[in-house]
């Protein structure tokens, strides 16, 4: 029996994607080999690789100006790879500080140039409860790029409208909310996302890059770290994480089969309404620190009156078959991660549990 998985990542995968992998694990398409045993330059794997790119391109409406890349190293590598490619000594880039992960990206940029904090919504206690307003941004037109983190898993905030950054390329870490809904890819110079939330398993990092933007990248860095190297070689410059990309393909095929990103957005908004509804019904018991306009659809955070009640909530939920609810060590409390593989019914079950928990423990 499978549990209801609210882990923040690696997160649950859609059951049809896992079942497809199970059925094809030993003998992939009659080849007598597992997909993970095939050469990354062989016909069998090439079909998977190209299908994954094609599915994502269609689902998201990626224009010809942009290219899909499959890399490794996670978002943490991208924190360094972005400035490595686009910052030069003496140059600056603007960073929008909205949480721990944007702080980490900012720190990596210091090795290559002069990152600048264009805005920070950190409170005196170093917590974040909102994303900034457009009028709070202090952007420089000479910046090499503007970097933001679209969703903040630890503190539960999310950009619901991306900022206007003028003619400066916008770079976004979308690791924790990529594909929760559709959006205009053409607005971005580069998007990166670790796969292990909404897209697949850990081990592969998705990049969607503006071809003209990455063409301006530095050439005095190792080839393996140049975006152009991977673009020119269809993400096959070195051996890619073939099994992870195969599972990404399965997840993308599932998204297409259920109705695409419009259907996912509908489900995700319904899930958020259910869970925040349970929180807001009991505001003295479930204390949600995030300002309403900045509430994340993917990661809902709240605290109970005491740490002991937090622990009881997690333990009781586990007995009911729900796991992954303990908050990040930085924030404490409870964190509910509702990525695409979490169903509306899963969240309805948790919301009912929350109402019952208040009655018995409140």
Curated annotation (Swiss-Prot):
Class of this enzyme: transferase
Disulfide bonds, paired cysteine numbers: none
Compartments reported by the entry: Cytoplasm
Residues bearing PTM N6-(pyridoxal phosphate)lysine: 197
Coiled coil regions, renumbered to chain: none
Documented EC number(s): 2.6.1.52
GO cellular component: cytoplasm
Keywords, in A-Z order: Amino-acid biosynthesis, Aminotransferase, Cytoplasm, Pyridoxal phosphate, Pyridoxine biosynthesis, Serine biosynthesis, Transferase
Positions bound to pyridoxal 5'-phosphate: 75-76, 101, 153, 173, 196, 238-239
Biological processes, Gene Ontology terms: L-serine biosynthetic process; pyridoxine biosynthetic process
Oligomer and partners: Homodimer.
Protein name per UniProt: Phosphoserine aminotransferase
